[in-house]
A protein has these predicted regions:
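Structural detector for short beta-strands of small beta-barrel domains
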Residues: 1-9
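Helix-rich effector regions associated with P-loop NTPase G domains
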Residues: 11, 37-65, 72-92, 96-98, ...
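Glycine-centered tight beta-turn/hairpin loop motif at sheet-sheet or coil-to-beta transitions
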Residues: 18-20
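Beta-strand/loop nucleic-acid-binding surfaces
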Residues: 22-38
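Conserved "cap/hinge" positions at secondary-structure junctions
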Residues: 52-54, 103, 201
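Phosphate-binding glycine-rich loops and their immediate beta-loop-alpha structural context
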Residues: 88-98, 102-157
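Canonical P-loop GTPase G-domain recognition
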Residues: 139-190
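A conserved segment at the C-terminal end of the G1
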Residues: 196-206
Length: 351
């Protein structure tokens, strides 16, 4: 029996079958031993084969139970290094059409290093990205100028950006259109307003929200597990004629099309994930890190040496472009930080 993982609460997974039936599932014991280097062998968004059982029930469980016996082929996924196990990865979500990163310029500030690490991981696993700049109603003139500069930088690199406010609803219609018909990952630091945005997009989600810490201007973890929520139909006033896949593709978009049986859930869905304070990249070889920074990869073709790391080598086109202000210093510093990953704590500045 085949189904979609729509919720992950640790060792238990909620699976929705093709027929709409829900099961509380665990991964079959010997399935865990197949050389999987992840803290979670399956993730929300995975299509799996399940075998109904009559055994152990999860705490407070009222659903029938089953064992997950097989993962169907993934068309993509996005991972980060497990926060406490540097040699293992954590699969954030699988089979997604769009990776949305909710960021804030202040209250709290999302570091450019965090943003760039997320973008690099999405590039590596061929997942299109939408940067959602939230809380625009709170910014003063200086912060607004910084926001404009950030959006200009990332749009110039080919990334789609939206400025939104969960309070005034600015940009929410544009966000609804961007998410329509797609399975979208929602990720971001704690405190950026991800849960509030989710409640506006999917009122039935009833995601918990919390006040920022007055001492640190950081958020508390209000989402403790990953869950998929179906989006409501797009209002008719926002519907536009669909374009062909070729005309709507963007840089970084995977050319791997989903199998018919794994097509996006109409009219779309959001995979909500717990807030994270750091984004450790996983399984990147040192010499390939620059491949996931679009501008560094393009300019790096002009370097004297094919294996240039853009640090101290002579004839480095990237260093020359940096000196000429042709690439952003923040992006280059993010690149350097990924070359020298040591601990998760440095990925986000302390307040």
């Amino acid at each position: 029996m085949r189904g979609l993982i729509i919720r992950n609460t640790g060792s238990w997974y909620t699976v929705r079958t093709d027929g709409g039936q829900l099961f509380d599932c665990k991964v079959k014991g010997n399935f865990r031993l197949r050389g999987i280097r992840s803290t979670n062998p399956v993730a929300v968004g995975d299509w799996v084969e399940i075998l109904p059982t009559t055994g152990e029930l999860p705490p407070g469980g009222a659903l029938p139970t089953a064992l997950i016996t097989e993962i169907c082929d993934r068309r993509n996924y996005i991972i980060r290094r497990a926060s406490n196990l540097s040699k293992q990865s954590h699969i954030i979500a699988a089979n997604i059409d769009l990776a949305c990163l909710v960021v804030t310029i202040a209250h709290p500030e999302t570091s450019t290093t965090f943003i760039d690490r997320f973008l690099a991981s999405a590039e590596a696993y061929r997942v299109p990205v939408l940067l959602i700049f939230n809380k625009v109603d709170l910014y003063d003139a200086d912060e607004q100028r910084y926001l404009d500069g950030m959006m200009y930088l990332y749009r110039t690199l080919g990334y789609e950006c939206l400025a939104v406010s969960a309070v005034t609803h600015q940009g929410m219609d544009a966000l609804r259109v961007a998410l329509a018909g797609k399975i979208s990952l929602f990720s971001g630091n704690s405190g950026v307003g991800k849960s509030t945005l989710l409640n506006l997009l999917v009122p039935e989600a009833r995601a918990k929200t919390a006040e920022l810490s007055l001492a640190h201007d950081q958020g508390q973890h209000t989402t403790t597990f990953s869950e998929l929520f179906d989006l409501p139909p797009l209002p008719s006033a926002l519907q536009v004629p669909s374009s062909s896949p070729d005309s709507s593709s963007s840089p970084g978009t995977s050319d791997v099309q989903p199998p018919a049986a794994q097509s996006p859930i109409s009219p779309g869905a959001i995979i909500d994930t717990p807030g994270i304070r750091g984004f450790g990249t996983f399984d990147f070889e040192r010499e390939e890190v620059s491949h996931y920074f679009r501008e560094l990869f393009q300019i790096g073709r002009e370097c004297r040496f094919g294996n240039c790391t853009h640090t101290n080598e002579p004839g480095c086109a990237v260093k020359k472009a940096l000196d000429n202000h042709e690439i952003a210093e923040s992006r280059y510093l993010s690149y350097l930080s990924m070359l020298d990953d040591k601990d998760e704590g440095k990925y986000r500045e302390k307040y």
